[in-house]
Amino acid sequence: MTNNVIIRQLGIQAYQLVLVAMQRFTERRKANTIDEIWLVQHPPVFTQGNASESEYLLLIPGDIPVVQSDRGGKITYHGPGQQVMYVMLDLRRRNLLVRDLITILEKTVITTLYKFAITTAYSKKDAPGVYVGDDKICSIGLRIRKGCSLHGLALNIAMDLSPFLLINPCGEVGLRMTQLSRLSPVVYNTTDVVKVLLEVFLSLLGGTNTGAIKTWHYNDYLNNSES
């Protein structure tokens, strides 16, 4: 039970729906609830973490909604072509500290990028995420509730980066964002990357997939039963 993980493919889902579903899944967890990993892309949205402040949003975002989130960190942008991986893990059961999970997520992205010939990716001690040169390619934000994690990472693969110009990403003034398609001469999409991302994460975590990747239905998280 300890190492089992259910993988769910959400496709493209509104951030607000997934946020509520994550919260309800975590609230209803029991000691024997199997951990889950959710793979998703979001329609364009800015999300503000618990540490976000109004000055991090530089310009009026137009048609892109701004959503308050309960994750750690500051403001970021999600959009199609960015692979998001949410990790709902019982950290106590896995004997992991929050810093341990952040390190695993960072190593997951660095190793994944290396497999796609991006060999210079690195992490920073005081700024969770993954960087290439001076630019950021992956953002990480977590929340811990009852010893369990929710939220996760967002890896830029082949997306429109221009909305990042409307904010100070992660609260860092002048921070530029980059993506795999800009750094690699080979064209990759999220399908190419997600298989490697998942394999690397499970290897570092010591997790065992419980079987085929499962579908996800929002209504499952509205009833009173455990998903």
Swiss-Prot record:
Gene: lipB
Group of enzyme by EC: transferase
PROSITE patterns: BPL_LPL_CATALYTIC, LIPB
Extra remark: In the reaction, the free carboxyl group of octanoic acid is attached via an amide linkage to the epsilon-amino group of a specific lysine residue of lipoyl domains of lipoate-dependent enzymes.
Record-annotated site: Lowers pKa of active site Cys: 136
Any Pfam family: LplA-B_cat
InterPro entries: aa-tRNA-synth_II/BPL/LPL, BPL_LPL_catalytic, Octanoyltransferase, Octanoyltransferase_CS
Pathway entry: Protein modification; protein lipoylation via endogenous pathway; protein N(6)-(lipoyl)lysine from octanoyl-[acyl-carrier-protein]: step 1/2
Reaction catalysed by this enzyme: octanoyl-[ACP] + L-lysyl-[protein] = N(6)-octanoyl-L-lysyl-[protein] + holo-[ACP] + H(+)
Native organism: Baumannia cicadellinicola subsp. Homalodisca coagulata
HAMAP family, per database record: LipB
Transferase in keyword set: yes
Protein name (database record): Octanoyltransferase
Active site: 170
Molecular function via GO: lipoyl(octanoyl) transferase activity
Ranges annotated as spanning the membrane: none
Annotated compartments: Cytoplasm
GO biological-process terms attached to the record: protein modification process
Keywords, sorted A to Z: Acyltransferase, Cytoplasm, Transferase
One of the record's GO cellular component terms: cytoplasm
Highest taxon, organism lineage: Bacteria
EC number: 2.3.1.181
Record bears the keyword Transferase: yes
